[in-house]
A protein has these predicted regions:
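Charged, helix-prone or intrinsically disordered regulatory segments positioned adjacent to compact structured domains
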Residues: 1-74
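Charge-dense, extended regions
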Residues: 67-135
């Protein structure tokens, strides 16, 4: 069963679930929400902070990115908290490679790069993709 909110996805991660799976399932939930209001409800509640600063920053970036890309009208206030930003750069490649790090630095979306997270240009890409929201 998919998490209903980003906060639930983080709870699952803290309880040992795979970060990649929990976040991917959350993105599916978000994309399948029938309205913009329902989508916003999935990111409105602040996820608990974890012992992993990368996850804390990543979920802030995810919520901000989804709110802006799907034109929800506003971004949850919790995404701007200092704990949602990294002090040091994090390049999300699985291996150390200067060329990959350079690529990620220049391809990262603003919502991620502003938090010192450097990832591909479509980090939340899913096969299903976003569904048109009823207005």
């Amino acid at each position: 069963m998919r998490p209903n909110t980003l906060a639930e996805a983080v709870e699952r991660i803290q309880n040992g679930a795979s970060q990649d799976v929990a976040l991917a399932e959350f993105v599916d939930t978000f994309d399948l929400a029938p309205t913009s209001e329902a989508r916003y409800a999935t990111i409105e509640r602040e996820p608990a902070l974890t012992s992993d600063k990368r996850i804390d920053a990543l979920v802030g970036a995810i919520a901000e990115y989804l709110a802006k890309q799907r034109k929800l009208g506003h971004v949850p206030h919790w995404t701007s908290a200092a704990a949602r930003y990294l002090d040091r750069p994090w390049h999300t490649c699985a291996f150390e490679d200067d060329a990959m790090r350079e690529y990620l630095t220049f391809s990262s979306l603003a919502e991620f790069a502003s938090r010192n997270i450097f990832t591909e240009e479509r980090p939340l890409r899913r096969a299903r993709g976003p569904q048109p929201a009823n207005r």
